[in-house]
């Protein structure tokens, strides 16, 4: 919808073929009132940047959905002019988030996201501007016994900005 908002002459089927999507269903005909509402929604997408897209898998397991999201996001980023190298960092930094209650699943998901980034950028592990990539995937054991006052102890080894963001996200989840 974002590409269509930028250029109404865009052909959905051609976009699907360009992205290499195997399955495509054209948009079904709608009532006029629905078309009006869709046009309104699409106009809101006109200024959408790829970094504004938030994808979260609340039960990420070993990260299969995160990796599928990574590929779709890579198509979006490259279609808007990003190189695959730069897009790999942007996706990990801005788009993909995952949670799981199993520590081992978290480790597998973290590994999967890091390897996917490495697949698109040979220098991915080195980081960008001296900042190492840090996938936003987390293991949440159980929150029944977590007190909000304990959040002040959370993330002491993280840089201040990342710690504050993580604490805000944790407060929201609690």
Q: What is each PLM-predicted segment?
A:
Residues 1-174:
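SAM-dependent methyltransferase catalytic region
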